[in-house]
């Protein structure tokens, strides 16, 4: 029966045809799509370039190289999945290319003929049909006979776009896609072949083609039967090939139980580590959702009645069917008592690589070594130079074509770095470009930048001396022949929590005599042995600064397991507050790539038990009476269900200017504000802890709880991180307002010899005061010396008079 289903699907697939011009424009794409929006990825070059001619997709033979062979295996696996498909209702998803990651239109030129996007299909879904609807424009200077844009999916031919000089704009054009072409990770490529009269010049700006970012990909899927295997985690809750924001429901029997919440936080941070930049949300329920997947955490005797009473003999992980949805999976994290529940959660957080290919596992006790300061796995070390090959795969440092696009190297650092007199960091760049008479060296260069800020440009090939050329010809050249090497500096202010090095190759082909064509495809790369060196930095900074929290979870992530931090919750938190707590732990896990096994959960009555820790307070204003004392060192107060921001006195203003001279310009908003934080408005306040100097209190507050979730989500959104500044942020949706009013304090240490520089750094008032004091001391010393000299001369004169 399985073979019959497979043959039937293959017969259906071979009958798919490319549709001609669509009869009408595609439907308007809604703002909130149910498909995974993916970040733009570098185009992936197919192993064998397909023909630019328009042919029947069903008759186009796939490439025969190794890449196509592995692709074909994945396609056959996709077809075989059809044998287990039930009669579930199909779901139609609609992507725009912009949702798939295209920041703007995909523009192809002769020097950069390939553009593409990467997207995933969840492993528990099977594609039954798909269609690509494209629109765009092509240069009127292109020759229709030898110019085209070829569309491929996973190296399988989809269709061809040809120019019409009289009508440069095209579309919408519709192409049916054979569903057998889809795999878990897919590559949609647009390959441009240009032709013109006379000699072909790849750098000719008049030869181009553009595909609109509003083009659409429509996919119809049906669910596959669930496979409940712990080894598949994080599936089915999250599929790494689908780069979308993740929603994972949690079911907790009790709204406040410190041990159960700690276990839930460990699991949430592990899922945050897996989702990384995508973000994750954990809605909290008291009962199992009617459909889909969920995670249930609690003691076995307190689990929801719908699950029965599973028999456990210790810490246990178990996957069972959703009682209301046979396609849904419920992950049970349980044990006979609360300590065993925490142990079971560590089985996921620290033992995921050893999870079995089974639906149940008894978890053995796990000993976790304490973390050291600033050793989060996601932060690059500041004790040595770091190779770029340690940060990204070698393939991410390679480019094809004359202008292969930006090669990005993301990295993270603790944002509290400080260097003596703002000494810059060092970046050693090594790169390779083609040898021989291929490139016009005078016009070819590599641009280096960081966080979208330009740093330096270098020629792809420095002029070699005659001796070097002769040695290279006889095969005794230098060991690094063909590798260009340069060292540049990065100002410290350009480096913060989440960073990205950017390399952009811009090569120009060398004009060939007699209209001879040069190579159509060249390879250039940044050497993985290139290094970035932050070893001249020390860990010290001035707080409060919510920008550090938004970019790297600082100061709480100084210890990756949050062992120097505690979370303060109300005595009886509602589901919204608990959900915000889990979302925050997910954010911490995504920031450090480490589970939060060291964090403590306390109520406001037990804050004294964690007085020596950094504190995170999650509360509504109605429940904040017990935690208002924790903001004693801030300029803000909570009383009568309102957040007050008092007007600073003249004396305090002068003192703040002496502490931070930039505070005069940093806050342009009124300093006297009063708000109830209602209607979804949330407040994020940071100040020094009144319980221990050098410790931080971060309070996330909302009038009714609705704003708490929005505050945590803002922390994970890169587009809003730049708006999070100062010591207070008021948030209503994406509308953020920042304030700076509270006194500053220092977190971290530096060597003794660096203390004067740290104390005077960016503080002209301190320099003036020290200068005046120094002048007074010098004058006092001189006056005393002159007085002593005068007294000495007086005695000498008196002695001479007596002798005479």
From Swiss-Prot:
* Disulfide pairings: none
* Region described as Disordered: spans on this chain: 24-69
Write out the pathway annotation from the protein's UniProt entry: Glycan metabolism; bacterial cellulose biosynthesis
Q: Which UniProt keywords apply?
A: c-di-GMP, Cell inner membrane, Cell membrane, Cellulose biosynthesis, Membrane, Signal, Transmembrane, Transmembrane helix
Which GO terms fall under biological process for this protein? cellulose biosynthetic process; UDP-alpha-D-glucose metabolic process
Question: May I ask which residue range the UniProt record assigns to the signal sequence?
Answer: 1-18
Report the domain of life of the source organism. Answer: Bacteria
What membrane topology is given? Answer: Single-pass type I membrane protein
Q: What GO cellular component term, any one, is given?
A: plasma membrane
- In this entry, the parts of the chain located on the Cytoplasmic side of the membrane are 788-804
Q: Which InterPro entries match?
A: Cell_synth_B, Cell_synthase_bac
Looking at the keywords, is Transmembrane helix present?
yes
The family line of this record is: Belongs to the AcsB/BcsB family.
What is known about its subunit structure? Answer: Tightly associated with the cellulose synthase catalytic subunit.
Name the record gives this protein: Cyclic di-GMP-binding protein
